[in-house]
């Protein structure tokens, strides 16, 4: 059965969440520090494992496609007050968790974490290790920009206990790079990866984006071939969402230079077929991995999870978000820090955590979240297990979803019976659409998301 079915894609391609959480972050609302502390207390009593996410917002230059929370500056001195504030937040957060809780994952994202010097990264990592209880052989990853990195900085990352790197490439074509203000050569990227492998980094991940200005199937073929030469363990292939009304840098992208919808689909189709032909496993949505990568193994073993950093091998971890705009998932809650750097500083100077909004999951949220995560990660839901876990009857609980599900079954996207809901091969690229059937929040927020393909 074909994975790529153009007729189905054209019929179902609409805006929808990436489901790095459920409910999605744009449903967060007022959330008190007292509520957060109740959730950290619950996490401690459960002895939940911890994943630390640390946001470094600074970038030397602006990439026009980017929708991340960032501060564009070449002034390296701005890192010092930010780190001082971050250290305060780390101290405050660490007091809310039990010392027996183990940190199994750590991720530095941005912005550009390698805006910091090697010494600053080591100091920040040491601070986290002093504040929390780290697993000896955990997964510790960092996003890097090859344009401003050298051998010494890679060695500093290794000293700081990082063992995985994520590199934003997006496209190796020079014309595309100029159009998005991110010129980065293949040789720069290869050099950094080679140094990382010499320093025993166990995994390299590369991010690509399809749908960028001046991009075509023919140009992107060459990018894919170069990426395959680098042979990263993981590849993320994101759909560019042009939302200039929300993301100011995107206003510098000429609308007429974007590939038309048909060409964009051709780029995606070829990319999908090429990567699978080169031995990569399609994990789901926007991720590919080599067969021996922990992501691929976790999917086979039924242990795959999805969070704000994408797919993950640690489903049991609570996420502690640190830094401006970072998002956490602790016990039965989601929370997000202040997005504005000034307000982030003010909160910490006043002696309280900079949490600005969040959400406590109700019973319905938990049921739908569990179902959506199973679909996103494993393309199948064991209905009887879900019913037993939450004391529900699937057919009656999701009665309002049945008409859409039956239509999807008629179209060959899914197979539904008393035992399971399974996403079929031709429906895997449209798994977000299947999840959207169960999303009770979607009718209020659909216009703010990217297309599902």
Give the label of every model feature segment.
Residues 398-399:
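Amphipathic alpha-helical substructures
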Residues 386, 403-411:
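Basic amphipathic alpha-helical segments that dock to polyanions
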Residues 1-50:
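Flexible, acidic/Gly-rich N-terminal and inter-domain linker regions that tether
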Residues 420-424:
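Minor-groove-contacting beta-hairpin "wing" of winged helix-turn-helix DNA-binding domains
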